[in-house]
Each structure stands twice: as structure tokens, then as C-alpha cells.
Amino acid sequence: METELVYGDGAIKFIYDNPFGQLLAPIIASKPISQLYGCYQDWSISKNKVPPFVEKFSIDLSIYKAGSVSTENKENSYKSFNEFFIREFENNERTFIEDNDRMPAFCEARYFGHHEINDNVKIPVKGKLLNSKDLLGGSKWSSTFEGGPLLVARLCPVDYHRYHYPLSGRTLDSFQIKGQYHSVNPLALKSKPEIFIVNERRASILETEEFGKLAYIEVGAAMVGKIIQRHDESTLHRKGDEKGYFLFGGSTVILLGEKGKWSPSADILSNTKNGIETYLHLGDEVALRGSH
């Protein structure tokens, strides 16, 4: 078990715990502010943040590809903080499990999981009810996932910020759900537990052979300049294909399934009951086919 080092924890505590900060929260969580801050991360001056960030959070750059600047020192190879933020793994650094009865992790992230969404399912950090209708913004697809399994993958600013398709299949539908840009780290969730259903998000409805239909929901967060889609959704996707990435800021991917089709892995379910997230590498087992 590890204790998380939170990037910008002082600012987040001020915004969500301080009465004056709470007055400013709606402004800070607005799309223009997040986009403006995201633009700053594209400027060349922002590259100066990379070395101290790497040192503070003990990031092992040997497992990542270098940036676009030719230099012997990898931490100086990124032309901006955003280029560093969306760094890619070296080839073959992560592999996706091949067993068709096991779902691989679609993000390198911290996971919560529930066997089924119902009136008793709450976010462990502060008892906020979750349901498919709210998560999907009242979409026509909401009923497809009622009573089905749920995975929440939370990405921290220190993490790999590209997200992938867990399984081969096709996209049936995709749509944007407008909202705000609150932080998704634990400090913010404790103060404002409804963040997952008020933040801006993008949903894709996927059809897979082994695990049925999936709702793949990317949740925007404070200071996320953009959520970039990398795959042409009119074409088929394969297990492990990159779906997209988040520019600067921690964020979250939520996965919903059809009732009885699959269940989160036992360790995730057990840890979730105790309010503990399970950290997984990209491609590790995250769920099993069938009802367990």
C-alpha cells in the first residue's frame, strides 16, 4: 500500500476546503480557465517544469520515449510540459493480456470497481451515488448499462496519460456531455463527490465480442486543456490500440458494462469495499468475463 503524493495539493486544498477558495471554484473549474492553463503547458517556457517534476515524483524516464528535442538528457528532450505529459512508453514496455476471458487495464491508473451499479453503489471517498443515467448524461444508452459493472480509472498528473481500448471491437456511438472542470483527485472528491457527473465528459459506446457492450467515458478535469481522440471511430479497433490522451491535468476514465457480462477483478472489488484504490499497469488484468 502506498500513500499518494498529490501534485498541487496546496492549491486544491485552498479551492475545496477554504471558504474563500470555494467561492472561486466555479471560475477555476470553467472551460476557458482550463483551456488557458492548458495553453501555457504548450509554451516552450513550460519545459523548465519538467526536471523538478521528475525529481519530486521520482519518475523513471527510462521506460518512456524521449521528446522531440535532440539531447543526451531525456528530461530535457521535451519541448514543453505538455509534450512530457503525454510521453509514450518505450516499445514493448507494456503488454496486454491475451486471454479472452480477462479484460486488460485500459489506463495506467488507480482503479475502483463495483460488480453492479444500483441504488447502493457509492463512490467510496464520500458516499456519492453513481448510476448509468447520470454518468451518461441521460443518454438513450443509459438503460443498456443499468445494474451492470463499473470501473473508475483515476489518472494522476504523474501518470502515463494515454488511454487505450481494452478489447477489439467497434464504436456504435459517441457523444459529448457538457460540464465543468473540477479536479478529480481525492482531496477534491471528498469536498465535491458529484464531480464525476458534473464534469465535462465524452462517452463512446463500444461493442465487443467477449464482453458485450461497453460505455467508455473520458472525464475532463481541472486544467485539462484538451481531451484528444486518436482513433477514427468509424473503423474497427483492436485490443491495446491507443484511443486518445489527456493534455495537462489529472483525469479519469469510467467503464460501464452490461449486467452479468463481466465483473471487476477480485482484488479491485475487495480494495474498493475498504475505500482503497488498486494501482494497475496498462494491460494488467482489470476484469473477468461472466458474473463472479
Regions found by a protein language model. Give the residues of each.
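Contiguous, well-folded functional domains in the mature portion of proteins
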Residues: 1-292
